[in-house]
Amino acid sequence: MEEIKVHIGKTVALMNDNIDTDQIIPKSFLKRIERTGFGEFLFDSWRYLPNRKPNPDFPLNALDRQEATILITGENFGCGSSREHAAWALLDYRFRVIIAGSYSDIFYMNCTKNGVLPIVLPREAREKLAKIAAEENVTIDLPNQQVISSVGTYPFEIDATWKNKFINGLDDIAITFEHIDAIKAYEQKVDSI
């Protein structure tokens, strides 16, 4: 997993509440087994018109927002089915940070396990961040747990374990390898019985 200590990036806002995983990545695109290639289908039914041309009214299609790496959204983001593909699609599109009012528990875990930092902020803060000009950057300071912008600095909470994983770029396998000596010692002990 790629580490995130301080992330500086552009934002795009999609302030709808209850965006479910079917809207994030429609089930018709889940036939592949790789974790990559899903970004082009992110929010597919909203991003594209029936003729597959980009919907000019959808925020991700705005020319000044196409480099965004921070998604600002509503309440209960990632609700619905528990497909991990939703986190893969967000990351593959290039989102490293999602700022929402709340998340589905399973979706939150899928994000943390796949390198997408889910942050919870109150609606007022998100509404202010959503109005930031396209040319402005927002800073995510993970060690100090702050979202820093021209419209304010907002503290956020994150579990210490997840914070450590993001700061050090550790996934579950890397954490397991941190304990390899203990694992080998245990295996030798069991083998000798």
Swiss-Prot record:
Gene3D superfamilies: Aconitase, domain 4
Pathway: Amino-acid biosynthesis; L-leucine biosynthesis; L-leucine from 3-methyl-2-oxobutanoate: step 2/4
Pfam families named in the record: Aconitase_C (PF00694)
Keywords, comma-separated and alphabetical: Amino-acid biosynthesis, Branched-chain amino acid biosynthesis, Leucine biosynthesis, Lyase
Reactions this protein catalyses: (2R,3S)-3-isopropylmalate = (2S)-2-isopropylmalate
Annotated GO biological process: L-leucine biosynthetic process
EC number: 4.2.1.33
Similarity annotation: Belongs to the LeuD family. LeuD type 1 subfamily.
Record function comment: Catalyzes the isomerization between 2-isopropylmalate and 3-isopropylmalate, via the formation of 2-isopropylmaleate.
Subunit structure, as described in the record: Heterodimer of LeuC and LeuD.
Database matches in NCBIfam families: leuD (TIGR00171), PRK01641.1 (NF002458)
UniProt name for this protein: 3-isopropylmalate dehydratase small subunit
Gene: leuD
